[in-house]
Amino acid sequence: MQWGLYFIGEIHPASSAQHKWILTATDYFTIWIEAMPTRNAIDSVIIRFLEGHILSRFSCPRKIITDNAAAFGSKKMVDFCHRYQIALAHSTTY
């Protein structure tokens, strides 16, 4: 199972709850999409989203493909993927 993770944003103006980003996850097999508005595009938000919306509902993905945003390559994110034996891949820059 492969998932793609991406942040959409920064959105101007922010929502009434001050959300400026949307974190999206796409299951590449079923094309199922999960999304969550966030205030920040940081690694702790990604990990909380994965634990609460992906791992607990769909099982552990074998691979996560992301863009080259700093939050996806942080030490916390790499450690998280290593702990769950998830291969972390970054798409090419275009």
Map each language-model feature to its residues.
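Retroviral integrase
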Residues: 1-94
